[in-house]
Curated annotation (Swiss-Prot):
Family matches, as Gene3D superfamilies: GroEL, GroEL-like equatorial domain, TCP-1-like chaperonin intermediate domain
Gene Ontology process terms (BP): protein refolding
Protein name from the UniProt record: Chaperonin GroEL
Subcellular location: Cytoplasm
Native organism: Geobacillus sp. (strain WCH70)
EC code: 5.6.1.7
Taxonomic placement: Bacteria, Bacillati, Bacillota, Bacilli, Bacillales
Annotated Gene Ontology cellular component terms: cytoplasm
Pfam families according to UniProt: Cpn60_TCP1 (PF00118)
Length: 539
């Protein structure tokens, strides 16, 4: 495949056209008066959304050089979404502003490496200052405000705040599509882990493709079960009780799996097998968690327990277990509350000691599963198109709220970025480095300017006034008033604002230091297929 190469100014200009096309499509959604974007779907109804990352991912441009520029900015939105779960439109607006300003200076002869240093310096100062002005989130009301701003819907804010109150900040909150018009909250007390049934023949509800076990016994082991003789004694005891059985094991295969499936199909008894969650030592810990929650024991040779000699007393109990293709939820485990409390305290102690980010995340998950439960927000709407749009909004709001709980909140509506303006402006830098700082200064005005423009106002007027206002005072584009943003409940999670700025700067710096771009040369279309006979006379 032949390649086409463009250099320096020509390359950057072509990529900038792509950046502008993508960013212009995304930034119309910013702020309380932002509009929606309609995305064509090959199948089904079009998707209407105001979610930056969803729009960015859909955009493919014909010109390969423009497309590369667009893809770079889509990466900003995508990375911000991965880290903070929201703020993707802000990140796109910041990236476009930095790239545009930077390109002007590079064209005028500035050194891209010097500019890059300046950008990095300015962003580091801005991030430190954002952390300094960040306020911790307190109470249900603050949580509701963050969620309501993100979803542009107060009702959603209340729902998410209630969900977090019910299952705790550590709890698991999932989204489902409701059959009706209303959006409601359903709290499932219980533990969920990401392992589904070993065989689809084990399902009890063919419509939902899930296995629902009422009052089951739960066998928990770290062994691989392939020989039916290993579990025959315990199966016989469970069958006598007339209750279903959930088997959590390293794996269930071969003869053992075949026997369980055949008996399920014949209606002799119901047993569902799932693989144990996690790996290595983490798996042992999670199995122990499940055992404590359900009042059972982990059948492990390390602990001197053998499958063949297991009695019904070693099995856990729960009022209900739901197993889907991907997840298992244990509801209302019959474990001793004192033992569960002790286990929770043990995990909390480990959380305080750990230095690894990954371990912390996994311990948080385990804590959530033991301490809280699972809250399900059932999203309802009149049409499928509205349902998809609403679901995306609520997903963003949920991520936003979690980010706020983690790192606190700052004034919303782009005000927080303007509040760090003076600190960034005070950076001592010379030459091209100073130019890099100025680029960031110009970029951090952009979200406020865009929010005002989307509300039909002159952005520059709002930006200039904001520079003279006290910190925390900002422009409420929804009402057209100047207010104390945090008091008015217009807040953004610090993590979202920080991630948007850092990711935008990272991609802008890469963009400005680009000197050559290589793309596939489009193939010449030679017209119709050769050798096709004349179709004359065919009806």
């Amino acid at each position: 495949m032949a390649k086409e190469i463009k250099f320096s100014e020509e390359a950057r200009r072509a990529m900038l056209r792509g950046v502008d096309k993508l960013a212009d499509a995304v930034k119309v959604t910013l702020g309380p008066k932002g509009r929606n974007v309609v995305l064509e779907k090959k199948f089904g109804s079009p998707l209407i959304t105001n979610d930056g990352v969803t729009i960015a991912k859909e955009i493919e441009l014909e010109d390969p050089f423009e497309n590369m520029g667009a893809k770079l900015v889509a990466e900003v939105a995508s990375k911000t979404n991965d880290v903070a779960g929201d703020g993707t439109t802000t990140a796109t607006v910041l990236a476009q502003a930095m790239i545009r300003e930077g390109l002007k200076n590079v064209t005028a002869g500035a050194n891209p490496m010097g500019i890059r240093k300046g950008i990095e310096k300015a962003v580091a100062v801005a991030v430190e200052e954002l952390k300094a002005i960040s306020k911790p989130i307190k109470g249900k009301e603050s949580i509701a405000q963050v969620a309501a701003i993100s979803a542009a819907d107060e009702e959603v804010g209340q729902l998410i705040a209630e969900a977090m109150e019910r299952v705790g900040n550590d709890g698991v909150i999932t989204l489902e599509e409701s059959k009706g018009f209303t959006t409601e909250l359903d709290v499932v007390e219980g533990m969920q882990f990401d392992r589904g049934y070993v065989s689809p023949y084990m399902i009890t509800d063919t419509e939902k493709m899930e296995a629902v076990l009422e009052n089951p016994y739960i066998l928990i082991t770290d062994k691989k079960i392939s020989n039916i003789q290993d579990i025959l004694p315990i199966l016989e005891q469970v069958v006598q009780q007339g209750k279903p059985l959930l088997i959590i094991a390293e794996d269930v295969e071969g003869e053992a799996l075949a026997t369980l499936v055949v008996n399920k199909l014949r209606g002799t008894f119901t047993a569902v097998a799932v693989k144990a969650p996690g790996f290595g030592d983490r798996r042992k810990a999670m199995l122990e968690d499940i055992a404590i929650l359900t009042g059972g024991e982990v059948i492990s040779e390390e602990l001197g327990r053998d499958l063949k000699s297991t009695t019904i007393a070693s099995l856990g109990r729960a009022s209900k277990v739901v197993v889907t293709k991907e997840n298992t939820t244990i509801v209302d485990g019959a474990g001793d509350s004192e033992r569960i409390k002790a286990r929770i305290n043990q995990i909390r102690a480990q959380l305080e000691e750990t230095t690894s980010e990954f371990d912390r995340e996994k311990l948080q998950e385990r804590l959530a599963k033991l301490a809280g439960g699972v809250a399900v927000i059932k999203v309802g709407a009149a049409t499928e198109t509205e349902l998809k749009e609403r679901k995306l909004r609520i997903e963003d709001a949920l991520n936003s709220t979690r980010a706020a709980v983690e790192e606190g909140i700052v004034a919303g509506g782009g005000t927080a970025l303007m509040n760090v303006y003076n600190k960034v402006a005070a950076i001592e830098a010379e030459g091209d480095e100073a130019t890099g700082v100025k680029i960031v200064l110009r970029a951090i005005e952009e979200p406020v300017r865009q929010i005002a423009q989307n509300a039909g106002l002159e952005g520059s007027v709002i930006v200039e006034r904001l520079k003279t206002e006290k910190p925390g005072i900002g422009f409420n584009a929804a009402t057209g008033e100047w207010v104390d943003m945090i008091e008015a409940g217009i807040v953004d999670p610090t993590k979202v604002t920080r991630s948007a700025l850092q990711n935008a700067a990272s991609v802008a710096a890469m963009f400005l230091t680009t000197e050559a771009v290589v793309a596939d040369k489009p193939e010449e279309n030679k017209g119709g297929n050769p050798g096709m006979p004349d179709m004359g006379g065919m009806m």
